[in-house]
């Protein structure tokens, strides 16, 4: 017997066995005996024979384990020894199309048969086995001693272990290959369930149908992802799980070309419908929920044989059964093509040969879903043992978003009955509370975002302008009004305004003015897309710069301060909320009360305000000595006006108010009136102290931080009216290159003071110069005299902040902007006063009432109009003041560089900020009808500043303006009122239309004063740092976007016999022969053939194993991402980085990839992590008026939908129009174009920040959660992928049979993995996360039994709407 065995070339070629385990035992026994048969002295010579022995062993043993798995139930497993000769190709199957026999006389349909083309794919798996030469030598050594036998046994064990390692690798490789094949044919359940619904497939693939399908995708993702987790907290969790599993079973196609094959059955003989492949934890949960029906099933004990003879590989289909081998095909089809079919003749074909395959009992868990038995197993242990990732454990990325700092519009309401303490409508949220993955409440405020919102790229308009030029290369040139100041060659302001308004019949309204008057809904409406197009940046006003004879270009000027943000994006109520914050953070107690404000407002709107007050102001023109000289007259006017009307005279002038408070507290005027004046001055002082407290006392280099925080504290913003030499003082102290334009002359050097400034000191010091002053007044051409007549500046007495608070805050609020600049003709004023007989007649008693001696004339008219009865001496003293009065009212244009935090610009003069200062002019109220004729002879309107350009007031000062506003009624609004470009150019000004719009619409209250002060906070990084420190709103909201990653465990369902697996013979080759070892490589050919007539597998996420990111509030550090961007002032740049908390490091540190993922410079710099990997939050600046409902549903963070799958025929042009064309409504919200114009438009701030096109020079590969929503190429790719995905799946699932001309393979379409693992990429939507604008809303939400999303006045809560539904627990309170 031994000799017989010894001569067999391949001993133990096949071992017949009934049980799978016996196969392995017999093969191993044969291997050990075969070791004894090998003879030879040289180990390397023996290795040749050993190679043949190894091939025998692998042929017998391999792939037995696969038959023991439940996964084999989804396959038809066949041994195919000639597989190595086959290449990838197509195999034809013939199927019959069923029909319906009609009973109404219609002709029956003919039988239709189709040829189905199935792709056969080969797979190559292999393993290496390395055997030591010493062990092989021991096998061939003589065994003479017991030690020899011991070494021999040890060598056999060593070699057997190595062989077992290789065989085990191949067996696992087969299982892994089959699982990979199944996954390749397994779309997500939400796709199959939706597209497989005949309700949709019967309607065709129109726009509406595709839109419905995508909506169902989204709904299924949110409602049914991770259904096992959701079932745990349901009252009917088991029924829900059964429903989900039933949907999975129903979604797949059970029809295969192997009809009737029942390879695997239960013990009772019932067919196993399929197999559920999952992970250990999911399997345990399912078993606990559903219970095990049976613990074993009957399956084949060996592979079926498949033999091919001939040149071609043919698989035939007859009677709906797959033939066992080629002989059956030959006998049935080829040899006897005309044979009549019979049951006896076709017994073998009908049985498929399975009656000859021996069966055995296989351990498996079976569950019953509906009426079907399904095997369930987990292969996770196989992967865990090999330390390879399990294919059913997938990492899924979900992007979340939430708002910070939104302002809820009026009327405000509450849906909560338990929240108390935050009822005030003035409370404005500056933070958002979120809950991280460990249920820790975290606050995200502006302090967190400083590393983003303070970065220079956030404050640079250049890229936005370039993007606009590329997107709209041929802009409408426009009218050019308000874009650039035009210097005038002369100093005659009357001529300037007269020439401008004379015959003017056309008014131009710049965009900045238009936006200030529309509502939020109107601005965002599709019909306003032209107006909205240039609203792309929160900090800049963009405009089209006309170029005669050339194409226009886009330019931008800085908005400078918060108040210049258009009202639709920062409404009046919001600014008043910021004012309340200003009061709170500075502990501001208003000195002024509502009564005083009402008196000022009544005075401003008093049609009988004495014109004589302006005459007195003109004679005093801010000079304290002249005020003291004329105190009796001033006291008389104040007392008369107060007694007659209860109103305050001279309240329009800061200097008059200050002088009254300083010199008239001795009872010369009524105590009540003096109290009002003192409250006005006290309010200004209190506001100044509050501003200084808010800004702090730090310095940046040599610049006080106060200059960079508030425009009111910036010395480069001068008061609007000047009577002293503030210009030289500015030039001497400024480092921003100030230029004072006096007509067409530039005063830019203090050394030229004598050329441009004529100082008028005290009257007693000018006694010797009175003749020269008179000669200059009479002889000089004041139109061409480019000299300013002002008094010397007393620095000890000069407080510009109080003056600016008065003119830029108090008066606009109390008068509702009902004021206009006024020029004075001093010569005519003097004539009115002096050319009267009693004034200088010695015969008239100085103490007599002058009205007793005046003849009819202008002076008598204005005195009678004001019911003022001065003495002759009072008028004489007033006339004396004229001796050193200025000659005319003049205008000086003050141009300075912007502060270094606002120095970025699109053009050179955009780096400048300018204002017009009215020299020796005044701010006037409306003039009464009875005084207008007199007023016209002495005064004229000078609309030079947005806060001092009320057209209705100007119309009362001169009939030319009255005729103008009558011809053009739309010019009666101060916001759109056209003024000469020689006086003002709105885009260059400190104050723009939104400030004037607020002043015109606000309620005159102390709160409005605080609001106007806070509106002067600058839109710059130092100001943001200051406001964030004090929890004060900076003027814009933020959309925070964060991507989190979860480790999800999936369920894969495969229907029975849906894949045919062909297993070939192994090939063993020596890969390497060394002196100490021999390496063998075992390669196996495997082929797979999908035999189902549709999708036979489906996958669904069932359980969240872990959340790998912290779901926290860590903000992106743009200083690290864009290290090359910097402010021009290095000291400022370093100050901002320090205050923003930017971690500095060497360039090597910046290159660490962790910095791009988590926003930290290096991992070793972190002492530790508490909640897992830091998830990066990115900031998208957002208007505070954005709809909060937008953040309560899955939406695109850029503010406009970007999913274009609903297009009839996909094209990039259509996709781009839907993305960027704001004349088309947002498909998700038909009432508007966008929810955030600063992010959704071409060239918007969000676009240039996160569109990778604009970051290529920095770090193109940087990780960014916002990139997926902004980078156009990515969006197009995802849209095209989704469009293709829907079309491809619809074509496969439409129900039409596949033919040879429509070769469709039922595999997952490209992009399916992205859809499953990154649904936010594909759907272009982020999910709302639990977020509350105040901690109290979060506490109320967690403590209420019936969970809801409460709204309480200005506070709101956003519930989490996402596929992963978290169990939220704060303390002992749980909310799901």
From Swiss-Prot:
A Gene Ontology term for the protein's cellular component = T=16 icosahedral viral capsid
The alphabetical list of record keywords is: Capsid protein, Host nucleus, T=16 icosahedral capsid protein, Virion
InterPro entries assigned: Herpes_MCP, Herpes_MCP_upper_sf
- Pfam families associated with the record: Herpes_MCP
Give the family from UniProt.
Belongs to the herpesviridae major capsid protein family.
What is this protein identified as? Major capsid protein
From the Swiss-Prot or TrEMBL record, state where the protein is found: Virion; Host nucleus
Q: Report the function annotation for this chain.
A: Self-assembles to form an icosahedral capsid with a T=16 symmetry, about 200 nm in diameter, and consisting of 150 hexons and 12 pentons (total of 162 capsomers). Hexons form the edges and faces of the capsid and are each composed of six MCP molecules. In contrast, one penton is found at each of the 12 vertices. Eleven of the pentons are MCP pentamers, while the last vertex is occupied by the portal complex.
Coiled coil regions in record: none
The record describes its quaternary structure and partners as: Homomultimer. Makes the hexons and eleven out of twelve pentons. Interacts with triplex proteins 1/TRX1 and 2/TRX2; adjacent capsomers are linked together in groups of three by triplexes, heterotrimeric complexes composed of one molecule of TRX1 and two molecules of TRX2. Interacts with scaffold protein; this interaction allows efficient MCP transport to the host nucleus. Interacts with capsid vertex component 2/CVC2. Interacts with the small capsomere-interacting protein/SCP.
The protein's matches in SUPFAM superfamilies, at most eight in alphabetical order, are given as: Major capsid protein VP5
Q: Which GO terms describe its molecular function?
A: structural molecule activity
């Amino acid at each position: 017997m031994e000799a017989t065995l010894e001569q067999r070339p391949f001993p133990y070629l096949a071992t017949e066995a009934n049980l799978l385990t016996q196969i392995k035992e017999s093969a191993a026994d044969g291997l050990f005996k075969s070791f004894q048969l090998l003879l030879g002295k040289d180990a390397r010579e023996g290795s040749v024979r050993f190679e043949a022995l190894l091939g025998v062993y692998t042929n017998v043993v391999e792939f037995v384990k696969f038959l023991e798995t439940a996964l084999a139930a989804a396959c038809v497993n066949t041994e195919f020894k000639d597989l190595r000769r086959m290449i990838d190709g197509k195999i034809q199957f013939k199927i019959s199309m069923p029909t319906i026999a009609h009973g109404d006389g219609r002709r029956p349909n003919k039988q239709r048969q189709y040829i189905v083309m199935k792709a056969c794919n080969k797979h190559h798996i292999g393993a290496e086995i390395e055997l030591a030469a010493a062990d092989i030598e021991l096998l061939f050594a003589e065994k003479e001693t017991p030690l020899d036998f011991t070494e021999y046994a040890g060598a056999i064990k060593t070699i057997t272990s190595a062989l077992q390692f290789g065989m085990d690798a191949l067996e696992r490789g087969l299982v892994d290959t089959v699982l990979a094949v199944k996954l390749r044919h397994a779309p997500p359940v939400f796709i199959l369930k939706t597209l497989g619904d005949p309700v949709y497939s019967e309607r065709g693939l129109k726009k509406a149908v595709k839109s419905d399908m995508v909506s169902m995708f989204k709904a299924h993702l949110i409602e049914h992802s991770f259904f096992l987790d959701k079932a745990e907290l349901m009252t009917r969790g088991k029924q829900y799980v059964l429903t989900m599993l039933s949907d999975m079973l129903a979604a797949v196609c059970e029809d295969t070309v192997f009809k009737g094959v029942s390879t695997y059955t239960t013990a009772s003989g019932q067919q196993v419908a399929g197999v559920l492949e999952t992970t250990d934890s999911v399997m345990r949960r399912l078993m606990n929920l559903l219970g095990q029906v049976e613990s074993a099933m009957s399956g084949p004990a060996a592979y079926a044989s498949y033999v091919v003879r001939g040149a071609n590989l043919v698989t035939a289909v007859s009677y709906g059964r797959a033939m066992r081998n080629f002989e059956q095909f030959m006998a049935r089809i080829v040899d006897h093509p005309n044979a009549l079919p019979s049951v006896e003749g076709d017994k073998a074909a009908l049985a498929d040969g399975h009656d000859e395959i021996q069966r055995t009992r296989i351990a498996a868990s079976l569950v019953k879903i509906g009426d079907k038995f399904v095997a369930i197993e987990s292969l996770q242990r196989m992967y865990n043992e090999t330390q390879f990732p399990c294919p059913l454990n997938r990492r899924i990325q979900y992007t979340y978003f939430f708002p910070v700092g939104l302002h809820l519009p009026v009327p405000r309401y509450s849906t909560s009955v338990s929240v108390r303490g935050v009822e005030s409508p003035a409370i404005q949220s500056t933070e958002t509370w979120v809950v991280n993955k460990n249920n820790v409440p975290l606050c995200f405020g502006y302090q967190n975002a400083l590393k983003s919102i303070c970065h220079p790229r956030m404050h640079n308009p250049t890229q936005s302008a370039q993007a606009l030029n590329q997107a709209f290369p041929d802009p409408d040139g426009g009218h050019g009004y308000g874009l650039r100041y035009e210097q005038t060659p002369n100093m005659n302001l009357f001529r300037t305004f007269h020439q401008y308004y004379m015959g003017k019949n056309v008014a131009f309204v710049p965009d900045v003015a238009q936006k200030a008057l529309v509502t939020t809904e109107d601005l965002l409406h599709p019909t306003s897309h032209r107006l909205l197009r240039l609203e792309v940046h929160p900090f800049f006003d963009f405009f089209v710069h006309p170029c005669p004879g050339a194409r226009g270009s886009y330019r931008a000027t800085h908005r400078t301060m918060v108040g210049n943000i258009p009202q639709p994006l920062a409404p009046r109520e919001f600014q008043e909320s910021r004012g309340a914050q200003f009061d709170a953070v500075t502990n501001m107690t208003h000195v002024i009360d509502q009564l005083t404000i009402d008196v000022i407002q009544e005075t401003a709107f008093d049609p009988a305000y004495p014109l004589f007050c302006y005459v007195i102001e003109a004679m005093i023109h801010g000079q304290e000595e002249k005020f003291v000289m004329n105190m009796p007259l001033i006291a008389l006017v104040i007392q008369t006006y107060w007694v007659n009307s209860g109103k305050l005279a001279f309240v329009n002038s800061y200097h008059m108010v200050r002088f009254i408070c300083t010199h008239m507290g001795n009872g010369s005027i009524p105590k009540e009136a003096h109290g009002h004046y003192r409250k006005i001055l006290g309010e200004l002082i209190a506001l100044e102290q509050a501003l200084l407290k808010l800004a702090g006392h730090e310095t940046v280099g040599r610049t006080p931080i106060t200059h960079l925080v508030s425009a009111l504290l910036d010395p480069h913003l001068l008061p609007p009216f000047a009577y002293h030499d503030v210009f030289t003082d500015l030039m001497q102290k400024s480092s921003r290159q100030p230029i004072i334009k006096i007509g067409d002359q530039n005063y830019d050097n203090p050394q030229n003071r004598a050329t441009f400034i004529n100082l008028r000191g005290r009257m007693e010091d000018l006694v010797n110069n009175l003749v020269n002053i008179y000669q200059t007044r009479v002889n000089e051409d004041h139109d061409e005299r480019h000299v300013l007549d002002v008094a010397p500046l007393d620095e000890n007495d000069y407080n510009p902040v109080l003056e600016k608070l008065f003119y830029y805050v108090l008066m606009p609020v109390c008068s509702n902007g009902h004021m206009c600049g006024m020029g004075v003709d001093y010569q005519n004023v003097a004539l009115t006063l002096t050319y009267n007989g009693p004034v200088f007649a010695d015969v008239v008693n100085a103490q007599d009432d002058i009205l007793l001696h005046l003849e009819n004339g202008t002076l008598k008219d204005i005195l009678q109009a004001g019911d003022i009865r001065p003495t002759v001496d009072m008028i004489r003293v007033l006339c004396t003041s004229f001796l050193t009065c200025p000659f005319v009212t003049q205008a000086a244009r003050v141009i300075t560089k912007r502060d270094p935090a606002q120095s970025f610009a699109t053009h050179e003069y955009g780096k400048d900020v300018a204002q017009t200062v009215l020299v020796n002019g005044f701010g006037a109220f409306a003039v009464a009808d009875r005084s207008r004729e007199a007023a016209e002879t002495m005064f004229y309107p000078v609309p030079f500043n947005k806060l001092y350009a009320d057209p209705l007031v100007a119309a009362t000062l001169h009939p030319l303006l009255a005729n103008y506003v009558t011809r053009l009624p739309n010019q009666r609004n101060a916001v759109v009122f056209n003024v000469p470009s020689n006086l003002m150019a709105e885009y260059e000004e400190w104050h723009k239309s939104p400030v004037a719009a607020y002043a015109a619409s606000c309620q005159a209250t102390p709160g409005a004063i605080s609001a106007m002060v806070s509106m002067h906070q600058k839109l710059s990084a130092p100001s943001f740092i200051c406001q964030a420190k004090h929890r004060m709103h900076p003027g814009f909201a933020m959309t925070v976007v964060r991507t989190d990653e979860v480790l999800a465990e999936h369920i894969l369902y495969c229907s029975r016999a849906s894949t045919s697996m062909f297993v070939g013979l192994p090939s063993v080759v020596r890969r390497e022969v060394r002196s100490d070892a021999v390496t063998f490589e075992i390669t196996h050919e495997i082929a797979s053939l999908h035999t189902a007539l549709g999708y036979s597998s489906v996958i669904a996420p069932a359980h969240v194993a872990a959340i790998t990111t912290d779901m926290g509030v860590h903000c992106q550090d743009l200083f690290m991402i864009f290290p090359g961007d910097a402010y021009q002032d290095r000291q400022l740049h370093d100050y901002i980085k320090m205050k923003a908390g930017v971690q500095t490091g060497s360039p090597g540190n910046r290159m660490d990839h962790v910095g791009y993922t988590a926003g930290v410079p290096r991992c070793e710099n972190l002492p530790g992590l508490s909640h897992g990997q830091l998830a990066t939050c990115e900031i998208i600046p957002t208007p505070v008026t954005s709809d909060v409902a937008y953040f309560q549903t899955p939406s695109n963070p850029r503010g406009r939908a970007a999913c274009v799958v609903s297009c009839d025929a996909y094209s990039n042009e259509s996709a781009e129009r839907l993305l960027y064309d704001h004349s088309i409504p947002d498909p998700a919200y038909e009432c508007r174009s966008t929810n955030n114009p600063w992010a959704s438009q071409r060239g918007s701030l969000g676009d240039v920040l996160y569109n990778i096109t604009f970051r290529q020079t920095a770090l193109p590969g940087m990780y960014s959660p916002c990139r997926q929503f902004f980078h156009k190429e990515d969006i197009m790719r995802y849209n095209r992928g989704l469009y293709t995905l829907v079309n491809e799946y619809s074509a496969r699932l439409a129900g039409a049979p596949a033919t040879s001309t429509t070769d469709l393979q039922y595999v997952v379409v490209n992009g399916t993995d992205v859809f499953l693992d990154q649904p936010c990429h594909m759907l272009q939507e982020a999910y709302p996360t639990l977020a509350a604008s105040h901690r109290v809303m979060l506490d109320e939400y967690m403590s209420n039994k019936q969970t809801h999303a409460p709204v309480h006045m200005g506070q709101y809560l956003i519930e989490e709407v996402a596929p992963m539904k978290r169990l939220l627990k704060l303390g002992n309170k749980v909310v799901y």
